[in-house]
Amino acid sequence: MNLPASLPKILPAGLALSLLVSGCGFQLRGAPPVSSALQPLAVDCSGDVPEQLCGSVKEQLSLGNIDLQPSEKADYVLNISNFRRERRASAITVRAAAAEYTLRQTVDIEVLTSDQVPLIAPTDLNSSETYRYDESNVLAKQREEEALQEQLYDRLAQQIIFRLAPLDRDRIDRLRQEAEQTRDQDSGQP
């Protein structure tokens, strides 16, 4: 086997670069991993949350090797509710027709332990996108809007995963302790 003369120089440099990059905590862009401390986890989507959004969250959690269980078997519950969708004209033509639309999706999330300790208080998340509207090509623009709605579902799902990522064992334990102290103070116990 005949190797190029530059290979012995490139190989150590490549190895050193990969060690340097992995050592500094570099990871590919995307959702950060959710801590294994947050399992078993239930994902509870209310009736107003589109199945595409709920399914996208569950899929991303499954890909992250998070054990998903029904609410009654889970130690933690991710509640996703109050989904809202808005479409409004953001620019108009000289003939007072819509030239651009902004699509916005909003959802509420919270994470509770099985004994109702809030790990993430109720929080609004939203995602939006603007697109040009051409009234002479309505069918294509409807398809574009549907594709954008799907992208917004995925972005919201990714935002939810980002919110779950900091919940490691230490943080969960600290939040539980704070909740216990608050309960003790409210009940008048030392």
Which residue ranges define each predicted feature?
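Surface-exposed short loop/turn segments
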Residues: 79-124, 128-146
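Solvent-exposed, acidic/flexible segments
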Residues: 46, 50, 54, 100-104, ...
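N-terminal segment of the mature soluble domain
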Residues: 36, 40-84
